[in-house]
């Protein structure tokens, strides 16, 4: 076994701000999205809720990509509860049940130290396994806003992506500036204090992935889009050698003109991989709309595709498997 895939689940109160996150049919349902994503990877459908996580317009969770890659390449997945409202109904490693607070009103993550410590300990244990690398994905609704807040606090002029083609950048920036006013800081003021940026504005997923990365000393693929840029920026500020890290994402994130993924990755100094998935010929509108800027990434979709490609499958194989899984979902839906 060369690679181990970890899926870190996180929640932040930021996802319940209307208009911030479409990683759930309603702002309230974003609280359930991480556990539903994890459950869907192992079952025909989630167990906590009798529905597949979708955007308000009905676009399926990117977990369908991760599940497709897993079914092809059969790599092992360990689910980690970084900090969520609910525990997933699948076997998982418990780091915390802390949910990130609304940073406009209070410090987002006072418990960051304990979360990092526990995740680091788990990373150190994984070091003892005969694996060469970790691939770490995430499911964290609202996480692109916390990530952008952390990046801004660290001094990066970053704009993060969104699961919507209409990136609510103005709303994000307004929310972030309210948080900065509450904390009494300006952009870039915490460039020398990465953990303070995490404490003030972060979420439990970021803290968990930072801890895992500090504990596991071999190669790490950060499987996510702009949220993993925040993780990378913190690790760099903590003095980590960025040569052992790579971000694996999808071409939909890389091509997102409303965000600065490529520029920010370059500024941090981390190499990136972009999964060349293509759903333009899908017979399902829910998948074709990925090509119109919906969803883009999540649940380690890019990293899972990368693992499938490493195992000898093509991005086309993954796309075909996604089609098959979506067809299965549609069939189940029509039977209910």
Curated annotation (Swiss-Prot):
Gene Ontology MF term list: nicotinate-nucleotide-dimethylbenzimidazole phosphoribosyltransferase activity
SUPFAM superfamilies, alphabetized: Nicotinate mononucleotide:5,6-dimethylbenzimidazole phosphoribosyltransferase (CobT)
UniProt protein name: UPF0284 protein PYRAB00380
PANTHER family: PTHR38811, UPF0284 PROTEIN SLL1500
Family recorded in the similarity comment: Belongs to the UPF0284 family.
């Amino acid at each position: 076994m060369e690679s181990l895939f970890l899926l870190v689940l996180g929640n932040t109160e930021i996802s319940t701000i209307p208009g911030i996150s479409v990683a759930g049919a309603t702002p309230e349902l974003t609280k359930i999205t991480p556990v539903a994503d994890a459950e869907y990877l192992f079952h025909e459908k989630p167990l906590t809720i009798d529905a597949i996580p979708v955007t308000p317009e009905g676009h399926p969770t990117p977990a369908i990509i991760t599940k497709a890659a897993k079914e092809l390449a059969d790599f092992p997945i360990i689910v980690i509860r970084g900090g969520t409202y609910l525990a997933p109904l699948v076997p998982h490693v418990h780091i915390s049940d802390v949910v990130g607070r609304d940073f406009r009103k209070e410090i987002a993550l006072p418990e960051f130290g304990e979360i990092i410590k526990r995740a680091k300990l788990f990373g150190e244990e994984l070091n003892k396994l005969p694996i060469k690398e970790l691939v770490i994905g995430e499911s964290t609704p609202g996480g692109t806003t916390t990530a952008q807040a952390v990046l801004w606090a660290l001094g990066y002029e970053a704009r993060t992506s969104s699961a919507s083609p209409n990136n609510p950048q103005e709303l994000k920036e307004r929310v972030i500036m309210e948080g900065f006013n509450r904390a009494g800081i300006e952009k870039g003021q915490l460039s020398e204090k990465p953990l303070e940026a995490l404490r003030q504005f972060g979420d439990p997923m970021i803290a968990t992935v930072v801890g895992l990365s500090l504990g596991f000393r071999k190669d790490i693929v950060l499987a996510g889009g702009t949220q993993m840029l925040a993780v990378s920026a913190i690790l760099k500020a903590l003095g980590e050698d960025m040569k052992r890290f790579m971000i694996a994402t999808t071409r939909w994130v890389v091509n997102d003109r409303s965000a600065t993924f490529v520029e920010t990755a370059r500024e941090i100094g981390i190499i990136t991989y972009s999964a060349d998935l293509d759903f333009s010929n899908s017979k399902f509108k829910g998948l074709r709309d990925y090509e119109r800027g919906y969803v883009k990434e999540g649940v380690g979709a890019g990293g899972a595709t990368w693992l499938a490609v490493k195992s000898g499958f093509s991005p086309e194989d993954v796309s075909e498997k996604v089609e098959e899984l979506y067809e299965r979902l549609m069939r189940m839906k029509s039977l209910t």
